[in-house]
Regions:
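Short, charged, intrinsically disordered terminal tails
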Residues: 281-298
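Short, structured secondary-structure boundary patches
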Residues: 235, 253-257, 297-298
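Short secondary-structure boundary segments
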Residues: 236, 259, 281
């Protein structure tokens, strides 16, 4: 992986070493332990080189070009081609793209291009799909104080990439995992005996960790904020009940709505004055953005 690609990943808030591990695992899935693309080896001379275009097949929002570039570079590193691949980006992450737009050109050994193609596209299409879906939510909330948040409902192994795609689409990350924010949910409350008891146990064990509490009623919201919670996750509240919770809590904590949210009702929930709308579908149900790799004909 080149220094410029690593720098681009860092600028996106991604760890190059982590991205490398993701790509290497994906390549092993596709190429097997011997790192072999039998079709390309059989049909394409080793010395042949070509240029290919990454082309959008649908309108959307782009995310993951640096990750796709890293795929081509890593295939070149480990495949023994002995020649470098050059990627020229013609669009940027976070930009809207239209069907037919050329997003980047890739030049290098033809075998390398086709061997890397599917892994590069799988990641690029997935990330761009998440960014596209997120942008629809961000647009739906435009003009309100509410922001759209992702969740931990991510594809195993791809959380960092998918959460970056949410950011590229105009969304916000709340927590990366179980380690950076405490989330007291219904099972924790049952185990501890009450919201207040659960909060106190978390605060005693981890004094510096932010604490969020899941609540389903206005009374629970008041109990949680009086206990000291930093954030409230208001689960499956109607807009009317949520507005009551917002009024009861005031500025003592940030409130996040979740549960059954759709683009059609986003405006109603945002109008309550809630700070965030938490949408698991950003990462667990976003369709891909169709992108293809087209070899240029001579």
């Amino acid at each position: 992986m080149t220094e410029s690609t690593q720098a681009a990943l860092r600028a996106a808030g991604l760890d190059p070493a982590q991205v490398r591990r993701v790509i290497e695992n994906a390549l092993v899935e596709d190429l097997g332990p011997d790192f072999l693309d039998v079709t390309s080896v059989a049909t394409i001379p080793a010395e042949q080189s070509d240029t290919a275009d990454l082309v959008a097949r649908a309108d959307g929002v782009l995310a993951g070009l640096a990750v796709a570039t890293a795929v081509f570079e890593l295939v070149g590193e480990v495949s023994g081609f002995g020649r470098t691949v050059e990627v020229s980006e013609l669009a940027r992450d976070g930009e809207r793209v239209a069907r037919g737009d050329v997003l980047a050109t890739v030049t290098g050994p033809t075998r390398l291009l086709l061997t890397a193609e599917r892994t590069a596209l799988n990641l690029l299409c997935r990330m761009s799909g998440v960014a596209t879906h997120t942008r629809a939510w961000a647009d739906a909330l435009a003009g309100t104080k509410a922001m759209v948040l992702d969740t931990r409902k991510t594809t195993p192994g791809l959380r960092a990439l998918e959460k970056y795609a949410v950011r590229a689409g105009g969304g916000t990350n709340k927590r990366m995992g179980l380690y950076d924010v405490a989330m007291i949910k219904d099972n924790h409350k049952l185990a501890a005996g009450s919201i207040t008891a659960a909060y106190r146990r978390v605060r005693e064990a981890f004094p510096e960790v932010p604490v969020q509490v899941e609540v389903t009623t206005v009374a629970e919201a008041v109990e949680a904020v009086e206990a000291g919670a930093d954030f409230l996750l208001c689960d499956n509240m109607t807009p009317e009940v949520l507005a009551e919770a917002v009024a009861a809590v005031g500025d003592r904590a940030e409130l996040e709505a979740t549960g059954g949210l759709t683009l059609e009702v986003a405006g109603r929930y945002a109008a309550t004055g809630v700070d965030f709308l938490s949408v698991g579908a950003l990462t667990h149900s976003s369709p891909i953005l169709d992108i293809a790799l087209d070899l240029r004909s001579e």
